[in-house]
Amino acid sequence: DEHVSEHHYEGGIKEFVHQLNIRRVAMHSEVIHVEGVREIELGDVSVELALQWSDAFSESIQCYTNIIRNKDGGTHMSGLRGALTRSVNKYAKDRKLLKGNTLSGEDVREGLTAIVSVKHPDPSFSSQTKDKLVSSEVTGIVDSIVYEKLGDFFEENPSIAKQIVEKGLLASKAREAARKA
């Protein structure tokens, strides 16, 4: 007995992220949208990402490969997480917003709602249920596209970038205080 749920949003995954955040207070009204393509031997791998930070304390990242939800994430999730942490830290360091330490991935992702969608000519999954993408080349592809495009977005939207850094700093301080308590 297989359960199928179908989503259709006029604005694509940007609108989907907006809907997922409807009960939260968004830190920035615009849903950040990033896309890019990289060529591999078998054809093109395209990456699309929509993300928005809110006042929530948890992160919510949904992963898709060729429109199929991968509930256990996979290599696209790894690429996204790495690029997010690096790009937020780079922006913060370049603007001298950090005092010494870098932000952890966990701190950067606090309050994040994101959807990462990969279209791949020949994806590999951990099982037939396609719950987890294991195509190793996808990590680097997602990482490079997200790092580059998110860096550009931060340069063009410094007030949003600063809010994201400040949210990460608050998360870091709270985590540190909890550790010492």
What are these model-derived regions, one by one?
Residues D1-A181:
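GHKL-family ATPase ATP-binding module
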